[in-house]
């Protein structure tokens, strides 16, 4: 446990940041889940709308370091591929 006042303050700040970052990570997962649900339901319009909403959030979290930039790129690429497959299957 932290003994000095500065260490106590840092521990408090770290806990505050950890919980905030956890909520941001959860938000990203929710946006991704919304896209996946729309894809599973084979609803192209809803999937595209959810993807359009998710991309800026994913990018913002990657810029902030909440998730790694490669993970953000991987999510966007895979979701985009699924939507493209859905659109070609629907056509």
Curated annotation (Swiss-Prot):
GO molecular function: small ribosomal subunit rRNA binding; structural constituent of ribosome
Biased composition (Basic residues): 7-20
Region (Disordered), start-end ranges: 1-23
InterPro entries: Ribosomal_bS20, Ribosomal_bS20_sf
One Gene Ontology cellular component annotation held by this UniProt entry: small ribosomal subunit
Entry keyword annotation includes Transport: no
Disulfide-bond pairs as recorded: none
SUPFAM superfamilies: Ribosomal protein S20 (SSF46992)
Keywords on record: Ribonucleoprotein, Ribosomal protein, RNA-binding, rRNA-binding
Protein's UniProt keywords contain Cell wall biogenesis/degradation: no
Domain of life: Bacteria
One Gene Ontology term from the biological process aspect of the record: translation
HAMAP family the record matches: Ribosomal_bS20
Family from the record: Belongs to the bacterial ribosomal protein bS20 family.
Job of this protein: Binds directly to 16S ribosomal RNA.
Protein name: Small ribosomal subunit protein bS20
The organism's taxonomic lineage, starting at the top: Bacteria, Pseudomonadati, Pseudomonadota, Gammaproteobacteria, Pseudomonadales
């Amino acid at each position: 446990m932290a003994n000095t006042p500065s260490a106590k303050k840092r521990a408090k700040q770290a806990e505050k940041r950890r919980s905030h970052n956890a909520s941001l990570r959860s938000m990203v997962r929710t946006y991704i889940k919304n896209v996946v649900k729309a894809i599973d339901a084979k609803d192209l319009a809803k999937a595209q709308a959810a993807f359009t909403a998710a991309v800026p959030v994913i990018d913002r979290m990657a810029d902030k370091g909440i998730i790694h930039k490669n993970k953000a790129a991987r999510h966007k690429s895979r979701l985009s591929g699924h939507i493209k497959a859905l659109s070609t299957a629907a056509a």
